[in-house]
Swiss-Prot record:
This is Pantothenate kinase. The gene is coaA. It is found in: Cytoplasm. One of its GO terms (biological process) is coenzyme A biosynthetic process. InterPro entries: P-loop_NTPase, PanK, PRK/URK. It comes from the Bacteria.
């Protein structure tokens, strides 16, 4: 047997080059204008009509099929049990490294899915709000590991997702400020009976330790109905992080309230050296130790090239 065919046979994913994936859009309509797409794009991402048409519309079509199937299964189970539970939200996880473009992908999906017919209520929550406050991280010696699994208030995040799946409302999530690099005290967003909830974060596919006493320990992805992993090679991610750091030095870091205001006056060479040091110390370590090992747990992997566009798509076999 051909070794490549054998490898493909046992590969848990079907891998599509960009051109093949784009054909799966079929007649899924484009519901976003160019100016709306531009507003969804993060500062260093490349997102345009072509990227939405060729990558995200096929994904939107796929998700519409998955959501409809889940709704039919829910109705069948309800009839079987003879109960009248409220329909639970369909939860989509979006994972991947710092600087890979998770926020852009999550916002694009929210915008596209919210324009399905009939118009579903689609909410987006990032796990940044579930980071422990800086004061707690400082006390525990975890500031250099912010974004690592141990830096999150996992019980609060699991409680939030459990309440969402249980149909409770409203459910509150803390607010995080990228300006102050900290949780905003006494500030919350409320999520109330969404049809679809998108949860975006670097470690949302993280697994927990195996139980020693036989009792199951829930993890965030236990609550997901579908998950997307944004992927790129590590040197590419580092370059994107450095580019973003330079852009922030000239914008957000200039604000005196910014946690990173001390970097605002760095020269280009100093800023690049600082960004690379942060990447190597924190973000690369988190990627290699915690984030990348969760990639095989995703239902769908979007692999990006150095130009920020998706080159191929891997869909987990059923």
């Amino acid at each position: 047997m051909d070794s490549r065919a054998d490898q493909q046979q046992y590969n848990p994913y079907r891998v599509f080059p960009r051109a093949e994936w784009a054909k799966l859009r079929h007649d899924m309509p484009m519901t976003l204008a160019a100016n709306e797409i531009a507003a969804l794009r993060s500062m260093h991402d490349r997102l345009d009509l072509v990227e939405v048409e060729e990558i995200y519309l096929p994904l939107s079509r796929l998700l519409s099929i998955y959501v409809a199937a889940m709704q039919r299964l829910f109705v069948a189970q309800r009839q079987f049990l003879g109960i009248h539970d409220r329909k639970v939200p369909y939860i989509i996880g979006v994972a991947g490294s710092v600087a890979v473009g998770k926020s852009t992908t999550a916002r694009v999906l929210q915008a596209l899915l919210a324009r399905w017919s009939p118009r579903p209520k689609v909410e987006l929550v990032t796990t940044d709000g579930f980071l422990l406050p800086n004061a707690v991280l400082e006390r525990r010696g975890l500031m250099q590991k912010k974004g690592f699994p141990e830096s999150y208030d996992l019980p609060m995040l699991l409680s939030f997702l459990s309440d969402i799946k249980a149909g409770r409302a409203p459910v509150r999530a803390p607010v995080y400020s990228h300006l102050t690099y900290d949780i905003v005290p006494d500030s919350w967003i409320e999520v109330s009976h969404p049809d679809i909830l998108i949860v975006e974060g670097v470690n949302v596919l993280q697994t927990g330790p195996l139980p020693r006493d036989g009792r199951a320990i829930p993890v965030v992805s236990d609550f997901f109905d579908f998950s997307v992993y944004l992927d790129a090679e590590e040197p590419v991610l580092r370059d994107w992080y450095v580019t973003r750091f330079l852009a922030l030095r000239d914008s957000a870091f200039q604000d005196p309230r910014s946690y990173f205001n001390r970097y605002a006056l760095l020269s280009d060479d100093e800023a690049i050296a600082t960004a690379i040091a942060i990447w190597e110390r924190t973000n690369r370590a988190n990627l290699e130790d915690n984030i990348l090992p969760t990639r095989p747990r995703a239902n769908l992997i979007l692999k990006k090239g150095a130009d920020h566009v998706v080159e191929r798509v891997a869909l987990r076999r059923l």
